[in-house]
């Protein structure tokens, strides 16, 4: 799986991951503000929410 792995303020970067999922994490009240992206599907703590997907570069 190829996932985006950059933090919000950094340029886009990708990584080939061993996990079968990618994720993006954002603040629940502001879905447009994505704080980070990466491999896997971590559990988020309030006020963050994680959205996971199963496709190359699906966490855009």
From Swiss-Prot:
Function per UniProt: This specific blocker of the L-type calcium channel (Cav1/CACNA1) is a smooth muscle relaxant and an inhibitor of cardiac contractions.
Tissue: Expressed by the venom gland.
Domain of life: Eukaryota
Family: Belongs to the three-finger toxin family. Short-chain subfamily. L-type calcium blocker sub-subfamily.
GO molecular function, one term: calcium channel regulator activity
Principal subcellular localisation of the protein: secreted
Name by which UniProt lists this protein: Calciseptin
Keyword field: Calcium channel impairing toxin, Cardiotoxin, Disulfide bond, Ion channel impairing toxin, Secreted, Toxin, Voltage-gated calcium channel impairing toxin
Cellular compartments per GO CC: extracellular region
Gene3D superfamilies: CD59
A family per Pfam: Toxin_cobra-type
UniProt keyword annotation of Transcription regulation present: no
Note: The sensitivity is higher in cells of the cardiovascular system. Neuronal, and insulinoma cells L-type calcium channel are more resistant. A total resistance is found in skeletal muscle cells.
Disulfide bridge partners, by residue number: 3-22, 17-39, 41-52, 53-58
Disulfide bond is among the record's keywords: yes
Compartmental location: Secreted
Region (Important for binding to L-type calcium channels): 41-48
């Amino acid at each position: 799986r190829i996932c985006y792995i950059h933090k919000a303020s950094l340029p886009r970067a990708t990584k080939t991951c061993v996990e079968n999922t990618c994720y993006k994490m954002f603040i629940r009240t502001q879905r447009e503000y994505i704080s980070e992206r990466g491999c896997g599907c971590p559990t988020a703590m309030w006020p963050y929410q994680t959205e996971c997907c199963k496709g190359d570069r699906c966490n855009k």
